[in-house]
Amino acid sequence: MRRILSVLLENESGALSRVIGLFSQRGYNIETITVAPTEDPSLSKMTIQTIGNEKSIEQIEKQLHKLIDVLRVIKVGQNSHIEREIMLLKVQTNNCKKDDVKHITEVFRGQIVDITSTTYVLQITGTAKKLDSFLKIIRNTTEIIEMTRSGIVGIARG
């Protein structure tokens, strides 16, 4: 099952490496990871998406708490937070596909951020589910030349 952990840690050299090393040593895969400084530049917030059952996630959480740089670990619940991800896609366009690509992008409230004679670069923001739905439709419409996704960022509600 998909799980999200929010980790508050010291913004110091090696802190990220130690967290990733813990996952690697235990044989856990990181699906996505995002890290950025918080409003306090001495701290960073890391959002990790992984796959595992409740027992394995609890074990990861306990091990993370033991790391010296880690100040707080929170298991993010399904309805207790807001999450977003950004995706950039470079797609092939020709005269008959441009209108279709533009329409699909608008329906998903995305943007065309770059245009050449043969390609569009699209930007879509939303939940992972929304991005996956967009990908499924756009793949049936045109060729994807290149794609990148940011990974999940999230914040608690309220």
Swiss-Prot record:
UniProt cross-references to SUPFAM superfamilies, sorted A to Z: ACT-like
Gene: ilvH
InterPro entries in UniProt: Acetalactate_synth_ssu (IPR004789), Acetolactate_synth/TF_NikR_C (IPR027271), Acetolactate_synth_ssu_C (IPR019455), ACT-like_dom_sf (IPR045865), ACT_dom (IPR002912), AHAS_ACT (IPR039557), AHAS_small-like_ACT (IPR054480)
CDD domains: ACT_AHAS (cd04878)
The organism of origin for this protein: Buchnera aphidicola subsp. Schizaphis graminum (strain Sg)
MF (Gene Ontology): acetolactate synthase activity; acetolactate synthase regulator activity
Catalytic reactions on record: 2 pyruvate + H(+) = (2S)-2-acetolactate + CO2
Protein family according to the UniProt entry: Belongs to the acetolactate synthase small subunit family.
Keywords associated with the record: Amino-acid biosynthesis, Branched-chain amino acid biosynthesis, Transferase
GO cellular component, one term: cytosol
Pathway named in the protein's UniProt entry: Amino-acid biosynthesis; L-isoleucine biosynthesis; L-isoleucine from 2-oxobutanoate: step 1/4; Amino-acid biosynthesis; L-valine biosynthesis; L-valine from pyruvate: step 1/4
Binding partners and assembly: Dimer of large and small chains.
Enzyme class: transferase
GO biological process per UniProt: isoleucine biosynthetic process; L-valine biosynthetic process
EC number(s) given by UniProt: 2.2.1.6
Residue ranges of every copy of the ACT domain listed in the record: 4-78
Protein name: Acetolactate synthase small subunit
Residue intervals passing through the bilayer: none
